[in-house]
């Protein structure tokens, strides 16, 4: 009689505890489901936001961050009384510094090769104008010596034979003309050359063809190329 009463008393308690554990697990699963649902929704919203951004947004963002860091480093160097360009050059390797200098020159007056004679003339005018180094002291002295009427001629002013260039000015002109002749003789469309890049072409035409192939199929053949370079069996 006592054993029956004990079994009857333990039965409802065990079933109740099982039900309680089941309800707890169900609530935990429900919370996990709600959390996953929320995170998925946030990711979908973020992907939709990124898809509506310009294609160069990430690159522009990285460039802005790099510019901000450069300004901060430049200010820190100035506060310490150091030359920022020299400090940056010491932190970089020589080849990287050379590439950055070439990139800066191309950005200042980019050479896109021959397009038209008008563009070539404009580039030459821009380069020659940037190379001008006016001597204001000589300018003022010449104006005082010649006088305002002769220095600022009109249609009735005779200026033939009144100008006597200095020796330094003539040397500068001669040097510039010789430089123009040398550049004209050696002119060619400058192409970027990376000495560390792998040589997988036999001529210029084959090089262009390989670039086109790599553009469309490079991601599929990268593993095969690595295996061939290592000598691993395919």
Swiss-Prot record:
<dbReference type="Pfam" id="PF08231">
    <property type="entry name" value="SYF2"/>
</dbReference>
<keyword id="KW-0507">mRNA processing</keyword>
<feature type="compositionally biased region" description="Basic and acidic residues">
    <location>
        <begin position="18"/>
        <end position="80"/>
    </location>
</feature>
<feature type="region of interest" description="Disordered">
    <location>
        <begin position="96"/>
        <end position="120"/>
    </location>
</feature>
<keyword id="KW-0508">mRNA splicing</keyword>
<comment type="similarity">
    <text>Belongs to the SYF2 family.</text>
</comment>
<dbReference type="GO" id="GO:0000974">
    <property type="term" value="C:Prp19 complex"/>
</dbReference>
<dbReference type="GO" id="GO:0008380">
    <property type="term" value="P:RNA splicing"/>
</dbReference>
<keyword id="KW-0747">Spliceosome</keyword>
<protein>
    <recommendedName>
        <fullName>Pre-mRNA-splicing factor syf-2</fullName>
    </recommendedName>
</protein>
<dbReference type="GO" id="GO:0006397">
    <property type="term" value="P:mRNA processing"/>
</dbReference>
<dbReference type="GO" id="GO:0071013">
    <property type="term" value="C:catalytic step 2 spliceosome"/>
</dbReference>
<feature type="region of interest" description="Disordered">
    <location>
        <begin position="1"/>
        <end position="80"/>
    </location>
</feature>
<keyword id="KW-0539">Nucleus</keyword>
<feature type="coiled-coil region">
    <location>
        <begin position="19"/>
        <end position="78"/>
    </location>
</feature>
<comment type="function">
    <text>May be involved in pre-mRNA splicing. May confer protection against toxicity induced by heavy metals such as arsenite, possibly by negatively regulating the expression of phase II detoxification genes such as gcs-1 in intestinal cells.</text>
</comment>
<comment type="subunit">
    <text>May be part of a spliceosome complex.</text>
</comment>
<dbReference type="GO" id="GO:0071014">
    <property type="term" value="C:post-mRNA release spliceosomal complex"/>
</dbReference>
<feature type="compositionally biased region" description="Low complexity">
    <location>
        <begin position="1"/>
        <end position="17"/>
    </location>
</feature>
<keyword id="KW-0175">Coiled coil</keyword>
<dbReference type="InterPro" id="IPR013260">
    <property type="entry name" value="mRNA_splic_SYF2"/>
</dbReference>
